[in-house]
Every structure is written in structure tokens, then in C-alpha cells.
Amino acid sequence: MAYPIKYIENNLVFNHDGECFAYYELLPYNYSFLSPEQKYQVHDSFRQLIAQNRDGKIHALQISTESSIRAAQERSKQEVTGKLKDVACAKIDAQTEALISMIGENQVDYRFFIGFKLLVNEQEVTMKQFRREAKTAVSDFLHEVNHKLMGDFVSMSNEEIWRFQKMEKLLENKISRRFKVRRLNKDDFGYLIEHLYGQTGTAYEDYEYYLPKKRFQQETLVKYYDLIKPTRCLIEENQRYLKIEQEDGTVYAAYFTINSIVGELDFPSSEIFYYQQQQFTFPIDTSMNVEIVTNRKALSTVRNKKKELKDLDNHAWQNDSETSTNVVDALDSVNELESTLDQSKESMYKLSYVVRVTAPDLEELKRRCNEVKDFYDDLNVKLVRPFGDMLGLHGEFLPASKRYLNDYIQYVTSDFLAGLGFGATQMLGEPEGIYIGYSLDTGRNVYLKPALASQGVKGSVTNALAAAFVGSLGGGKSFSNNMIVYYSVLFGAQALIVDPKAERGRWKETLPEIAHEINIVNLTSEEQNRGLLDPYVIMENPKDSESLAIDILTFLTGISSRDGEKFPVLRKAIRAVTNSEERGLFKVIEELRAEGTTISTSIADHIESFTDYDFAHLLFSDGDVTQSISLEKQLNIIQVADLVLPDKETSFEEYTTMELLSVAMLIVISTFALDFIHTDRSVFKIVDLDEAWSFLQVAQGKTLSMKLVRAGRAMNAGVYFVTQNTDDLLDEKLKNNLGLKFAFRSTDINEIKKTLAFFGVDSEDENNQKRLRDLENGQCLISDLYGRVGVIQFHPIFEDLFHAFDTRPPVRKEVEE
């Protein structure tokens, strides 16, 4: 098969038959966890894209390109700011080396290219037009003669190029209404051709194709050598494979085509292009050469086939024998197809479908070929590997190429082509940023930029910086949350972690490289910490202090703002303290006693009954305590010793006094985070609320969480909620203000359904439920800024980070032995 490409101009490829194809990259769309309705929407868009071409040819390619891990990591380094820049860059470099040693310099990245044959507009026949056509024909003949004699240059008429460019603009406008596309350029074509001829190890984004042109007034010249340069290699054709030798290695390639489709490909579940990305651990390429058969021609072909089948039926009847079931079934299908074509006036499509499998040696090629055949077998598609036709099928992958074999044509409808899932993939996260792990379905690295949401990025479905980590105990919530906070701090963020279980107390020892920027505030019940959590001490603004004092005292005493007798008395006492010189919660008790009424004395006694608990004196001061908690370091951790948090199942009415005091302290600390949020707006900040459910269950906590989230959005701060159930976050206002979401393993079916609904995916779909139930430690469902949902494995890479963030109790050595 001769090399088909005659000339390349931007995204236009001219072949030697006078045809011109316009090629585009179909920017992949996320297909994972879509509901059937959403899948049908994509299907209809693609069907209309194909059906709008009433005539001509379409060439669709799924190509396994390579993307550079090192380049992504280097781009990530550009995102780093702040005091820990040197530490972060060293960490990213170590990450890069570890990733490259595990998976190599490049990762497989599937790209989708689609080419449409441009049809010349029918123009009125005029003398001027006739003369122009004659002139073009003569010049083409002369160029062909020159080319045959000299063979050095290819000449292309500028007028011809300009005419096709005008048509391509109209086509691009039509396509881009339905899908995001990018016009290809010479570098794309160069990479594609070199890839087909055995080139490996080059990252797609680093590749350059040198194709100089010389433009004259009437024509443009290009060296023929430059056009065929990407095909440089030694090809040895065998009956069942090609041996392609390049300077840096040898590749063996085998080609399959469809022999027959023996059953129905039911949509959704027939998306071959989508599922084969997940199925195979090795790269494969696929080509679809589609010739459009106009409706009239298709009807004529179908009716001729119908006559043949009827003849067979009559022949059997005349010979007193039964018509075979194959003929009867075929007649039914033909009748159905005829009525469909007649009613819809749609075209039919001649499909030549070729799959390319490559391997470094013959043994591996054989194994891969068997795997590909088995995969297609399961979908009722029988593949065949034609003897002696490998080079011809190889040629079908080249841009603007012709169909090589007519023996394996499948007549299909636009519905069938749309149901193959062309362009569907699983995309998660950002192209660069914090490396958090990899997608379990595609194996691709996943990067996040936690501060990006507020920038209003194109395509994002949220501008909320807040994030949620949900899941049952031991699934990896705290670990993954710690990892994201740690890397965010390295990348320049400032963090405040509320650590009620005191799990992060050893971070200065376990994270020595950033120990100088870690500040651990451990509030024990010692005398020197007395009153540090008093609302009047911890908050700078007196108004904020007053508001927090009301929240805490109503929470502890159970006095509702709707209580017409007690609430006004308490409110009056708090306001009096706010307006006085010496401010503290003990002063509120004094103010209530000074009131002298039965109600005020009763409230004073009630509040005072809390003050003699072990660590309650953290909450109460008499106005002589000064604020000494500093949050100036990059990573600040606040711990309160001896906190007793209620169980998740305990209702608010059943809280013990210790539990009430513990939750009250968490509310104070979390409100203190408001002051932290209102610092420098140019620095991204994180407020991390571990065990957030404990205060999200009470009214004061819910109000506070919304305050934090709203302030965070305005002041460039993300509030991270780490909690066990989505119920805690299902308040509509809060739910709509969450950006990134992570859900870890859950076994309770009701919780699973709620989590799936929280992620906006079909909660009744059994496959979705099974995926969430079967997650292993460190694996989670993620929803990114663009609303894309997938399953990832968190990957800390470094053992020291794993040990630092691991919250499991240590195993005794004797047990191990």
C-alpha cells in the first residue's frame, strides 16, 4: 500500500487521490459514573455529529500516546510558593525519581483523532470556472510528470489549499457545537506517523516535526523527503505480524479486523473505546475507516439483498424443503432495516475497524493478542488476523488513507458508531499540582490544586474551596486528609488543624524537614492554660466574643433563644460583660448573681456547675487572661487533652456533661479558626476539622460551619470536614458549598446510597454501590472541581510520610514474631 499523504497544511491532509481530510483531536470527556440518561445524551450528540455528514468519509483513531511524568512534576514545581519552597521542590524531585523507577519516564495517554473528508461544494458551471478547472488539471499533470522525473518536491496549488480551508472553517464550527475539539497541526501528524512506525519513549508534548515549506504566488512546495521522514524504519513483513526496527529498539505489531458481530451490542455497555482503556495494561491503537453510503444508495443495497434472500426462500419452498433459520432471521433484519432507513432518511456506513497491538517481543505479542481477542469475544465481536495483510491494515491508520480490505466491511448505522464510546475516558484532577495517587481504572497519576476552585476555572462546576472526607472508621479518611494538608503546606498554604483525638502530636519528630514550621498547641488542664478557650480571651473582636459566648452558654445550659424567660436574662448579662473593662465567662456568672432574680440566680448556678470539671477551667476566665495562642507558623495543630467526644450514634439529649464540655471546646476552637481565616487573603489557608460530626450534629455547630465556609470562600481559605456520615453534610446550604469530595469504604447500604447521591451519581445503580462497598484501605471515590467522579488509590510514595500519617495503633513486636 503506497504512502497516502501528499501534503499537510495545518489540520488538512491531502492524499494522492485528490481527497482532502480535516483532522481534529476530540478532547476526551469524562465518562465514569455517568447515569444512563447522561450516557444517552453523549450518545445522541455523537450520533448527530456522524449523521450530519450525508456523504463522504470519516477516519477515527484512538491512539496510545505517551505523556511525560517528569514534565508534569516540573510543572508542579512552578506552583510552589512560600517559606517551604526548597523543601517542596526537593520532595517533588524525590517523588519524580520514585514514580519513574516504578512506571517509567512516560505514562500511556489515550488520544482521540477524527478526520472528515471535505467535499467540494457544487459550483455553477461557467466558462470562467471551466477554464480554471482545465488549468488546474494541466498544472497537476505537469507537476505529476516533474515529480515522477525528479521526485524531490511536492507541489500544491495555493488556491486549492485556500478553498479547502474555507470549507474546514464551516466544518469546525459545526463540530465544536457538540464536542470540544482542537485542530491538529504538523507536530500531531508527525507524532502519529512516527508512533505507527515504531517510535517509543517520546512524550507527546515534547515532540516536534520539522516540515519546512516554500510558498510562491501560485503554489507551495514541500520536500517529499520531509513528508516521509516520520516513517524512517526497517519493516519486515511476516504473515501474522510486522517487525518494525528503529534505531532505539524493535517493536512487533499485529493487526486485527472485525470478522463478524454475532450479537447485539446493547448501549450503554457497548462502549468498546472506553472499556478497552481500563481493560488492558498495555497500549493498543484502534482505527475506524467509515465510508458514508447515502440513504438512497443504502436503500437500494438493502432491497437488492432482500430480493436475494426472497429468492433463497422461494427456492427452498419450490423444492419442498424448509428455509434455514439464518435466511429467515436475515429477512427479518433486512425488513426492519429497510423500514428504519425509509423512515429516518439516514445514511448507512461501511465500517472498516482495525485494532493494532504492539509488543517488545513475539511471546508478549502473542499473549496480548489473545487478551484483545478475548475482550472483544465477550462483547460478541469476533476479530480476525488476516494472513499476509498486515502491512495493508497498518496503512489504514495513516491520515487520509484508503480502506485496504473490502472483505471485512461491516454495514452499520450511526447508532452503532455512537455507541462505541469514542472519546470517552476517565479524567480526574488537574494536569499538574499535588500528586495524591492514581486512578484505579486507568492507572493514570492524579494531581490536585486545592486552591484552584476560587479562581473560577473554565469547566469547573464549583468555586467552593471547602472539602469533605467521609467514610466509616479505618478506611483512610484521616490519612488522605493529612497527606493533602501536608502537601498543601509544602506548596505554600497555611493550615490550622483541629485535632480532638491528639493523633498529630508527634509530627515535629516524624516530619523533621518542616518541624521548624510546625506549631503544636496542646491545651492541657494545667493552671497556665486556664481560660485560654474563654470566648472573651480567644477572639480578638468583642462582637465575635459576645456571639461565641452566647453560643457556648446556650449550648451548655440548653437555654433556647425561644425561651422568653431565661434567654433575655442571659443575653443581658453577656452584653453587660462585653461592654465592661474586664471580660470573661466568670464575669457573666457574677453579672447574673448581681441581677438578683430567681431566674438569673438559677442560670448562674447552672453555668457554675460546669466550672469545677477537670478541664472546664480552659473555658472560664475572670478577665485577667491574655490570648497566647499563636498561629503564625505554616502548620498549626490545636489539641485539647482529655476531650471526651460522644459516640456518633448518641443523640444530643443523651450527651454527658464531659461530652457537652468537649463539644463546646471544639466549637470555641473552630470559631477561633475564623480569626485565622481572616489573615492575609493572598495566602491560601486550610482549616481542617477532624471528627467534624461531633459539632455538626448540634445547631450551633451547623451555623458555625456555614460561617467558616462562607468566610473561607471570601478570604481564600478551604474548610476541610472529616466525618463519618454524609448525613452530617447533607444540609443543602453546606452541601452546595463543598468543592472536592472524598468518600472511603462504607458497608451500610443506606449510607452508601446517601454517599452516591452526595456525589451526584446514580445511587440505585448496583455497580456503583458495589464499588463503594469493595474499596480497600486508602482507596476512595473522588469528585473533583469539574464534577468528574472516579476511584483513586492514595499513594504517599515515602515510607516516612506513611508512618507519620498512619493513625492505626502500633502492633506489638511479639505478635509479629
Model-derived regions: residue spans:
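Extended, folded cores of ATP/NTP-driven motor/assembly subunits in large transport
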Residues: M1-Y411, F422
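P-loop NTPase motor domains
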Residues: P36-R54, T65, Q277-F280, V293-S300, ...
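Short glycine-/polar-rich loops that comprise or flank the Walker A/P-loop
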Residues: R54-K57, Y110, F491-A493, M715-A717, ...
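P-loop NTPase motor core of the ASCE superfamily
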Residues: S101-M102, N541-K587, L729-E817
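Charge-patterned, long linear interaction tracts outside catalytic cores
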Residues: T126, L440-V446, A451-A453, K458-G471, ...
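Conserved P-loop NTPase motor cores
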Residues: D313-H315, A451-V485, V498-G505, V521-E526, ...
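Post-Walker A helix-loop "phosphate-sensing" segment adjacent to the P-loop in P-loop NTPases
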Residues: Y486-L496, E509, A515
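Short, structured coil segments at secondary-structure junctions
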Residues: I514-H516, N737
